[in-house]
A protein has these predicted regions:
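Helix-turn-helix
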Residues: 11, 15, 19-53, 57
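Hydrophobic/aromatic-rich alpha-helical bundle segments in the mid-to-C-terminal region
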Residues: 109-113, 121, 139-192, 201-203
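An amphipathic alpha-helix signature
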Residues: 91, 95, 128-140, 183-194, ...
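Solvent-exposed, amphipathic alpha-helical segments
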Residues: 15-22, 65-76, 107, 164-172
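N-terminal intrinsically disordered/low-complexity leader segments
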Residues: 1-4, 201
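Short, basic, alpha-helical segments at the C-terminal edge of helix-turn-helix-like DNA-binding modules
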Residues: 5, 30, 60-67, 72
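Amphipathic alpha-helical packing segments from all-alpha helical-bundle domains
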Residues: 96-103, 118-144, 156-163
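Hydrophobic alpha-helical connector segments
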Residues: 57, 71-101
Length: 203
């Protein structure tokens, strides 16, 4: 019986992913999802209390990955800024971006292009503001740890950098860049970003 329940849940998740990608959150109805899953509408609600709850379950691995990237890079227990000088830093950052896109491509498309009307519709704006605060706090922490680190950057410039990251993701996804081209674009982005930050921080 438990196996049947697990299989049913997987069918619902698979069918709803396809429908959300095709029609968007607003266009896909719970009736559509139930029909595509081979379950009754009432049974669908047994597994997920609402369409929004189902949408959030589908996208949670992707949103968790983005939150994790922020915490690892700029959280209070994240990287020390001195790591930016290591030769391995650029490759590590590139691998992190590539990994998120490879593992969560369809979910990122839903999050960035198909989430209108859901509780995740404003995720991009929420994340940009959170990342801006996080990076500013991280810079303050780094200045207390490294007495020779003396540079100023405006809050809005940090905000723009976070917006730029999402623009990069959106363009890669919108144009369905193949893996090799995605890697080349991300390599240029990471190189450009690191050269700029090193110049600004005089390191």
């Amino acid at each position: 019986m438990q196996t049947l329940k697990t299989d049913t849940r997987k069918r619902i998740l698979a069918a709803s992913r396809n429908l959300f990608l095709e029609k968007g959150f607003q266009g896909a109805t719970t009736r559509d999802i139930a029909c595509a899953s081979g379950v009754t509408l009432s049974n669908l609600y047994h597994y997920f209390p609402s369409k929004d709850a189902l949408f959030r379950v589908l996208l949670q691995p992707a949103t968790d990955a983005l939150e994790g990237l922020l915490a690892e890079r700029h959280g209070q227990t994240g990287y020390d800024i001195a790591k930016i000088q290591e030769d391995s830093y650029a490759e590590e950052e590139l691998d992190e971006y590539l990994g998120i896109i490879r593992r969560h491509r369809s979910s990122l498309k839903m999050l960035l292009f198909k989430s209108q009307g859901s509780s995740l519709e404003g995720f991009k704006e929420y994340y940009v503001e959170k990342a801006t605060r996080c990076v500013l706090d991280w810079f303050k922490l780094m200045k207390t740890k490294h007495s020779g680190m003396d540079f100023e950057v405006s809050d809005f410039f940090i905000h723009l950098n976070n917006v730029w990251m999402f623009t990069l993701l959106e363009e890669i996804l919108m144009h369905d860049l193949p893996d090799e081209e995605t890697r080349a674009v991300l390599t240029d982005y990471v190189r450009f970003e690191l050269i700029g930050w090193k110049k600004m921080m005089k390191i």
